[in-house]
């Protein structure tokens, strides 16, 4: 965005979804009093908020971006109201928030599956990001192991789909590597 001074090929939704995800896990970490969750998700939320500000700055449709950000803030405020005012005790609050965050995380990990069908049809991985795939695999694995260490299913379970989808994408990078399955050898001049 900064290099091109444009947001023309970049979607806002992933930034908003990741920010909401970080803020949800930050709340869960605060309820659990888990320093690791608090620190990691505070940094994640700050970075995602910065990305959103940069997106807003370079966007030509500032009103549309602002409405989406306000929609996210309204959703977060409603969630905060539900979890603080309508949920009777801290254990129930923690369980509900853990379930919400887990569901949201799973949805984020399985959402790129639509791209996988496109990759298989086109026999090309051009629409996938290799660095993002590796990073997702490492982050999902780390959070799964951390959840296992804490015996916290809310942390462990939603990260397993991240591992699975990353392994599938890594296999696709191998399977549809450039130059693989060509019936001829290119001539070099």
PLM region spans:
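Alpha-helical membrane-protein topology signature
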Residues: 1-189
